[in-house]
């Protein structure tokens, strides 16, 4: 697998930054095989993980301590509060597995007395053929099996147990579901034969994993819940779109009376405007639509029935795109989406800071922001800043980002209050408490709270104009003021 493809896989992870402070264990409680790296870390892979990229969003990776290595156990015990950690539980139904046949599971941090549950689906793109799955298994095995999962994890952002980092949801029961099915949480296919030697017959059971997680949580208090939030980033966000109504129905069947809501972060993609290699032999050359078309057959993927009925046989891949699926979803949804999502740009071969940028690509970037904005206008609850980044809710500084003076944390709280005072489909915001927030300004980074752009070579912050100039754009020809900071003018435009 070439380095570009490997880097793309890492960029699409969208995983949570966590700390693990116990030894790895297998489902039976026996020590797992030792990984090549003795200090396994679950980190958020943002643009800074890409060797081909010269820019990163500041704050894309949360700071974390590394408990691995000799003599670190006592130190980590004093630094970390065990009560804040999520503990690993493997599924009771052992027939529902990860890609490689190892046990699937979830991490849980209970908050005694709480009737609110936050269930988070991890992201990580997908594989859609024997070749792409073999490459994925070789380079990122933890996204296809549970052998090296840590016994505990610590959440960040909306998954944090710290009130200052997570003021509205710190006191909820928090569940983190690791992504190990590579099927955008849609698969319904068991392996046809057991693993033989080095040859692996992959299972794709993402949809079933979610079902079994819900079943296993019912006796742990989920049945008594008043509010259940199914959240996810990137591929996990798309997984929320695909599974939210099924989760609601399953809980109803289990006798629960909870209101089920969905939170979709960076999982609202648009179809590519530029057709790439038709056969798309690897992830680097495959658009989301092409990957989903191929993957659906491999995964025996399941999409919401109401949406599926709108398309001809073999065309149900359309239901993976939020702007086409949204109107067929019954459960309330809150969509979080950067208007200039880095992964959406990468689909179009636009890599900020790592290559030249043509005038056509610059124009396309601006049009992308407009198209995304237009696709979100009828979404009841939305937070869409005009920034260059990918994923938001698991960043440790997630409360810093604002639109028109309102943070995402505040918008979520306003959305929560709206259920107590209004119909779920009402667009009437509570006075001074909005939850439909889309930046008005048209340019990338025109919101003053956007994550900073960092030059990876110098680690210095750069303005958007500096980035564009470094990529070869003639700013004067485009009518951009090279002498001043244009952000002030853009912000006054309503951002």
Swiss-Prot record:
Active site per UniProt: 234 (charge relay system), 341 (charge relay system), 390 (charge relay system)
GO biological process: motor neuron axon guidance; negative regulation of canonical Wnt signaling pathway; negative regulation of Wnt signaling pathway; protein depalmitoleylation
Origin superkingdom: Eukaryota
Residue stretches of biased makeup (Low complexity): 26-39
Chief location category: secreted
Carbohydrate-modified residues: 397
Keyword annotations from UniProtKB, A to Z: Glycoprotein, Hydrolase, Secreted, Serine esterase, Signal
Signal peptide: 1-18
Transmembrane segments: none
Single GO MF descriptor: palmitoleyl hydrolase activity
Protein function: Carboxylesterase that mediates deacylation of target proteins. Acts as a regulator of growth cone migration. Does not act as an inhibitor of Wnt signaling.
Family: Belongs to the pectinacetylesterase family. Notum subfamily.
Name used for this protein in its record: Carboxylesterase notum2
Organism of this sequence: Danio rerio
Native organism taxonomy: Eukaryota, Metazoa, Chordata, Craniata, Vertebrata
